[in-house]
C-alpha cells in the first residue's frame, strides 16, 4: 500500500476538476465516469457544476433541466438517479452525504464501489474502490480465472481489495489503483515495465497479462427495428417527451410512427443490451398528441434530446433550412 501511495503522488493523475475533498463533486464525477471516459466527462462536469454547484441546488432543479445537461452522455438512468439521490440527501441527511459506505450504498444510483469512492476520497473512510480499471489490475495481479461479473470473481476481488487498501491513506491508494488501471495496466499493451505492481504481478511473471481479465462469452446483441416520424410545421420539428419507462425517459424525442410519411433517412444506435435500427419519415403537420413541443434548430441543439436523435435532425439534408 505504501508503494502505491508514493507512486500516485509521483506519477498518478492530478488536477482533474473533481479531485477535491468535496463529497458532492466526487459523487457527481463518479456517476458521470461510469461507462464514460475522463476526456468526455470533463466538459460535462464543468457545465453541470456551473448549473448545479451544490446538492441543494441540484435537488431543487426540475427533471428537464438536469436531462438537458446530461443529454449526450448516455445511460440516462444515471441522471434520473442523480436527481433522486440529491433529493434524498437534502431531505433525509440535511444536504450532507453520509460518511459510511453502507449508508451511501442505500442511496439511489450508488453501488458499493461508488460509495467507497465517495467515502474514501471525501472523508478518508477506509474502503476500497473496485471499478472496471481496478478489476483489471487485480485479476492480473492474482491471475483470477473466474470471469469478471461472476459471483466468484467479484467476491475474490472485493476481499483482496479490502486486504490491500491503505489504512492511513485510503483515498490516495484508491486513486493509485484507478490510475494504474487507466494509464498503465491498460486493456491492451499494458506498460508493465513502469508498473509499481509488476514485482508482485502473477500475470506479468507468466507473460499472460492480456489473458486477464477473463470475460464471459459474449451474447449476440439483439436488433430492434423502429420507425419514427419527424413532424415538421411552422418552421419547427415537433417532438414528444418520453414519459414511459425506457432508456430515453425524460428526454424529448421523435414519436413512433403512427401514419405514413416520406422516408428521409435512418440511423442506428447501440445501447448496452441491444442495437436500434431506426427509419425516419417526414410528415408536414403537427402531431395530434398533447405532449408535443415545437423545436427550432437552436432548441434542438441545446435541448434534452437523445444524442442519436439530435445528430440525425441537425445533420439531415432534407431538414436543412426548414427548421
What function would you assign to each model-found segment?
Residues 2-193, 197-206, 210, 223:
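Catalytic cores of DNA base-excision repair glycosylases
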Residues 1-14, 19, 182-323:
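Intrinsically disordered, low-complexity, charged terminal extensions of DNA damage-control enzymes
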Amino acid at each position: 500500500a505504501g508503494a502505491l501511495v508514493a507512486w500516485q503522488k509521483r506519477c498518478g493523475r492530478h488536477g482533474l476538476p473533481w479531485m477535491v475533498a468535496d463529497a458532492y463533486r466526487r459523487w457527481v464525477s463518479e456517476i458521470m465516469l461510469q461507462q464514460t471516459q475522463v476526456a468526455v466527462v470533463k466538459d460535462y462536469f464543468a457545465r453541470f457544476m456551473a448549473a448545479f454547484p451544490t446538492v441543494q441546488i441540484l435537488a431543487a432543479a426540475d427533471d428537464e433541466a438536469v436531462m438537458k445537461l446530461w443529454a449526450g452522455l448516455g445511460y440516462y438512468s444515471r441522471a434520473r438517479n442523480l436527481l433522486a439521490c440529491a433529493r434524498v440527501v437534502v431531505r433525509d441527511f440535511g444536504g450532507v452525504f453520509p460518511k459510511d459506505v453502507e449508508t451511501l450504498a442505500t442511496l439511489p444510483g450508488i453501488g458499493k464501489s461508488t460509495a467507497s469512492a465517495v467515502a474514501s476520497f471525501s472523508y478518508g473512510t477506509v474502503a476500497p474502490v473496485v471499478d472496471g480499471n481496478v478489476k483489471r489490475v487485480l485479476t492480473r495481479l492474482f491471475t483470477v480465472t473466474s470471469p469478471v461479473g461472476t459471483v466468484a470473481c467479484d467476491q475474490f476481488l472485493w476481499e483482496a481489495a479490502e486486504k490491500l487498501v491503505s489504512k492511513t491513506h485510503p483515498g490516495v491508494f484508491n486513486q493509485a489503483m484507478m490510475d494504474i488501471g487507466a494509464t498503465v495496466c491498460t486493456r491492451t499493451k499494458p506498460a508493465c515495465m513502469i508498473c509499481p505492481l509488476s514485482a508482485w504481478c502473477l500475470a506479468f511473471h507468466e507473460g499472460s497479462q492480456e489473458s486477464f481479465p477473463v470475460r464471459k462469452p459474449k451474447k449476440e446483441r439483439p436488433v430492434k427495428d423502429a420507425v419514427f416520424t419527424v413532424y415538421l410545421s411552422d418552421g419547427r420539428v415537433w417532438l414528444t417527451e418520453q414519459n414511459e419507462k425506457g432508456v430515453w425517459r425524460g428526454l424529448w424525442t421523435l414519436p413512433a410512427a403512427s401514419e405514413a410519411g416520406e422516408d428521409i433517412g435512418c440511423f442506428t444506435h447501440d445501447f448496452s443490451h441491444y442495437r436500434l435500427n431506426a427509419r425516419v419519415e417526414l410528415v408536414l403537420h403537427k402531431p395530434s398528441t398533447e405532449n408535443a413541443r415545437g423545436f427550432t434548430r437552436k432548441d434542438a441543439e441545446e435541448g434534452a434530446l437523445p444524442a442519436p436523435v439530435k445528430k440525425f435532425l441537425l445533420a439531415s439534408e432534407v431538414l436543412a433550412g426548414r427548421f
